[in-house]
Amino acid sequence: TGLTEGVIDVNTYLPCAGVYKKVTPNPKCWIYPSAHGNLNVSQGIQHSCNDFFYEVGYRLGLNSTGDSKLDNDTSDGKSTQNYYSSERGIAKLQKYAEEFGLGDTSGMEIPESDPQISDDNSVLSAIGQGTNNYTTSQLARYITAVANKGTVYNLSLLDKVTNPKGKTVKDYTPEVKNKVTDVSSTTWQAVHEGMR
């Protein structure tokens, strides 16, 4: 989301100090009391750095004036805090969550819980916290779409149904729900590099 929305690029390095101070209460990286230091997006994914993605969630919530003040911002956000809106960031996160199929059930043939895309706190939601609520099958469909560069499939537990003689009665071929088309090849490359 951050790469596609332009709040970071593949050459952007963001600091992890172990504690993120631009919002209160101050969320912590999983490595706290240590820190990861400066990371690019591939390294942020590789190390699963909370602080990196807290900052992405924060930047998603900035208006254009706030964006222009990032170069002079401090670790506590004094230069940008007046231009931050969690609702603005949440709207962007929700848009991409929907594109990747997280707003719907996975398509399996059994009952499953309805998903909940976070509607609260863009900073925490950027690392999957907030009010997100998904089943493992919904997350599996999402990560499959990330791995295959944007094809979202409806999941199936069945391959085929056969009669007693082994003849196929019904074939369950993979069904494409949608394709995510607004992600650049550079973004896919950076994400996949981080996931290796």
Label every model-predicted segment.
Residues 2-196:
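Beta-lactam-recognizing serine transpeptidase/beta-lactamase-like catalytic domain environment
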